Amino acid sequence: MTKSPRGAFVTSDGVQLSYIRQGSGRPIVLIHGWSQCAEEFKHQIEPLSARYDVIALDQRSHGESQKVPYGLKISRLSKDLYDLLAELDLNEVALLGHSMGSCVILCYLDLFGPERLSKIILVDQSPFVTSDPHWTPQELEEAGAVLTAQQVFDTVAALRGKEAEQVTRQVMDGMVTRQATSEVREWIVQCNLKMPRPFAGTLLYNLCHTDWRDVIPRINLPALIISGRASTMPWKSQEWIHRQIKGSQFEVFEEPEGGQHFMFIENPEKFNRLVMEYLG
C-alpha cells in the first residue's frame, strides 16, 4: 500500500495539525479515537478514495500533529475540526468518528450545529463512559458507562507514571478480538504511544467526564451508528443512540466478524462496504 499524501494547517490557537488527504469527490473526514492516529484508517483511505475526497486528521498531540500541553479537551478538538473544514473550504461533509472521534462530532454539532455537514457516522462510542452510582439499571445501560470515577482517576494517574506504557498495552489489548494478530495489536499500541502519556491522561479525564445524552436526541442529520457485539463499549448504549436519532441506521459487528472496538481494522471489508453503501 502506497503512503498517502499529507497536508498540514495551523489552528486558531496556533497548533500545527497534520492530515492525510487522498481521492476526489464528496468529502469525508475520518476522526480517530483517544490517543490514536490517522494512519489507523489505512484500510479505509484507499478504498474510499476511489469515490470520495478522504481526509484523515491527526488531532492535536496525536500522530504526526504538533504535541502541545494545552487544548486537550473534546471542545477544543471539535474547534480544531471546525478550523480544518474552514481551512480546506469543505462543504456537504460526511464525518466519521471512531470512539472519542464520535464525541468530537457530537461536540461539533453541539457548538456549531450542522454547518458544513451532510451526514455523520458514529463508530463504537458510548454516550457517557463514567458511571453514576445513583443511576438506575436502565440509565446505566443507556449511557454505556464502563468505568467508575475512581477507575478514571487511577487510569489517568497511571498514564502519568512510570507504568504508562504497560497500562496502555493492557487497555489496548482489551479492545480487539481473540482473532487479532500480535502484529495488529502492536501496531495499535504504537499508534497510541505517539501521543505523550501525560497528555493522553489529561485528554482521557476530559473524555470520561463529558455526557452527550442531551446532544444526541437533537441531531437532525442522517446518521449511521456502528457497534461491536463484543466491544468494550456496550452495544446496547449505541442502540439507544440509534433510537434517539430519527431515521438513523444501526449496524452491529458480531464477535466472529471482528466485532470489538477496532472492527474497522479487524474487518475492513465489511466496514468499508457499510460506509460506502450509507454514503452512496
Annotate the PLM regions.
Residues 97, 101, 105:
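Gly/Ala-rich beta-loop-alpha elbow adjacent to hydrolase catalytic centers
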Residues 256-268, 272:
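Catalytic histidine-centered segment of alpha/beta-hydrolase-like enzymes
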Residues 1-29, 50-53, 90-91, 194, ...:
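Alpha/beta-hydrolase fold catalytic core
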Residues 131-137, 154-217:
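Conserved alpha/beta-hydrolase catalytic His-Asp/Glu region
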Residues 75-93:
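Conserved acidic catalytic loop of the alpha/beta-hydrolase fold
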Residues 106-111, 116-160:
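Flexible "cap/lid" loop of the alpha/beta hydrolase fold
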